[in-house]
Every structure is written in C-alpha cells, then in structure tokens.
Amino acid sequence: MKVKASVKKRSADDIIVRRKGRVYVINKKNRRHNQRQG
C-alpha cells in the first residue's frame, strides 16, 4: 500500500473509502493501486 499526500482513482475498479479518518483507495483486482492518504 502506498502512502500519499493526495490519493486518486487510477482505474474504474478503484473504490475510495474513509476509515478512522483516513482516506483509502482499494482495488481487489489490481492490488498495486492500493493507497492511503497521510
């Protein structure tokens, strides 16, 4: 999982989720796209 200052969708399969005040991008098909903001 990459930690970035700004997270963006990289493909149509990406889902943006907020958990515990953090923003995550989650992708089940291509796990390389997983990101966390902060």
UniProtKB/Swiss-Prot annotation:
Record key words, sorted: Ribonucleoprotein, Ribosomal protein
Gene Ontology biological process terms in this record: translation
Keyword Repeat: no
Top-level taxon of the source organism: Bacteria
HAMAP family, per database record: Ribosomal_bL36
Protein name as it appears in the record: Large ribosomal subunit protein bL36
Gene: rpmJ
Keyword Ribonucleoprotein: yes
GO cellular component: ribonucleoprotein complex; ribosome
Similarity remark: Belongs to the bacterial ribosomal protein bL36 family.
GO molecular function term, any single one: structural constituent of ribosome
